[in-house]
Amino acid sequence: MAPRPLRRHPPLHHSFHESRRDPVADKHRINFEPVDIEMEVGEDEYILDAAFRQGIHLMHGCREGRCSACKSFVLEGDIQMEDYSTFACNDAEVDEGHVLLCRSTAYSDCTIELLNFDEDELLGGVPIQDVRTRVTRIEPMTKDIVSLRLAPVEPAGYEFKPGQYSDLHIPGTEEHRSFSMATTRSTPGHVEFLIKKYPGGKFAGLLEDGISVGDEIALTGPYGSFTIKEGHVLPMVFIGGGAGMAPLLSLLRHMSETGNTRQVHFYYGARTPQDLFYVDEILELGRGLTDFTFVACLSESMDPPPVGAIAVEDGNVTDVVGRREPDIGRAEVYLCGPPPMVDAALELLEANGTPKDQIFYDKFTSPAFE
């Protein structure tokens, strides 16, 4: 069936929270193929948000129209897409009928083909939760990375999968910022986030003088599909930089806790030795795995050399991976960090023939609009 053209409509205010939805908004039915799942969606919400609201966990990443994790194909129906990056869905794809579900609103009953999905996750993922937390620690890790530790208060626990992220709500506003958890469910009394401080950033300002130990912060989540795929056996390559350490550390902690026997090569990119952190714990976690290597990739300076039994290479992280991983086309690759690093890594993987279904990534974008 040929795709229907996308209709253009004025921008909509949206949220998956039931209390913010318009009870009189027109409703439509969405049928997802090839999984044969049907749900209801209102004209006041994005399709991805409607899925979250009804416990359907579609593949997704940024939820801001910047990545392509939720890209799908409209088989039938009228859909409008707004406020998205053409790098995630270009004009030719839009003309063909592709949409990003995180930025798409339905104006009729629709049939949508899911291009990326995990059958085990669709109806069995972790539910989205609203959690009231209390700040228990704010600790600088480097000159621009801060560890923020939150203790769940109401409810008293927070369920998530290693590698996922949460929305942290900025107190006194309706705004939020998204950050990945570095911890696992083995520490139910606290959740740790590793946050990069950007000049002028609103959350960075909070970390400087806006919040203190004992203050409350609301979070919503978990989100994201940057998780270990159970039952997979391929070697794993982790490539990270900056605050991209958080989800990779969560994955590594989880693998150590569960006795995972897969091979892991972990490459972390930084400018100088002073930009490295959590190295001792990473090496300790690695000693509990079957086949683990950690390589620090320093792009600007090797002086002074890092202390301890750590492998260090000179150069950008993607260049180091290219030299050391000739068989990366036969590995599952997890990428997390600044967009230029992720884009360079994706080019490397494409050149080496790594299948797309073996690549999982999160881009940590800076809040330039602040």
Swiss-Prot record:
Enzyme Commission number(s): 1.18.1.-
All copies of domain FAD-binding FR-type, residue ranges: 128-229
Gene Ontology molecular function terms on file: 2 iron, 2 sulfur cluster binding; metal ion binding; oxidoreductase activity
Domain 2Fe-2S ferredoxin-type: 28-118
Biased composition (Basic residues): 1-14
Essential cofactor(s): FAD; [2Fe-2S] cluster
A Pfam family annotated for this UniProt entry: Fer2
Chain segments annotated as coiled-coil in the UniProt record: none
InterPro entries: 2Fe-2S_ferredoxin-like_sf (IPR036010), 2Fe-2S_ferredoxin-type (IPR001041), 2Fe2S_fd_BS (IPR006058), Beta-grasp_dom_sf (IPR012675), Cbr1-like_FAD-bd_dom (IPR008333), FAD-bd_FR_type (IPR017927), FNR_nucleotide-bd (IPR039261), MRET (IPR050415)
Residues that, per the record, bind [2Fe-2S] cluster: C62, C67, C70, C102
Residue spans crossing the bilayer: none
Cofactor note: Binds 1 2Fe-2S cluster.
Keywords: 2Fe-2S, FAD, Flavoprotein, Iron, Iron-sulfur, Metal-binding, Oxidoreductase
The UniProt record lists the keyword Electron transport: no
Induction (free text): By propane.
Region of interest: Disordered: 1-21
Family matches, as PANTHER family: NADH OXIDOREDUCTASE HCR, PROTEIN RFBI
Subunit and partners: The propane 2-monooxygenase multicomponent enzyme system is composed of an electron transfer component and a monooxygenase component interacting with the effector protein PrmD. The electron transfer component is composed of a reductase (PrmB), and the monooxygenase component is formed by a large subunit (PrmA) and a small subunit (PrmC).
Functional note: Reductase component of the propane 2-monooxygenase multicomponent enzyme system which is involved in the degradation of propane via the O2-dependent hydroxylation of propane. Reductase catalyzes the transfer of electrons from NADH or NADPH to monooxygenase.
Similarity comment: Belongs to the TmoA/XamoA family.
Annotated protein name in UniProt: Propane 2-monooxygenase, reductase component
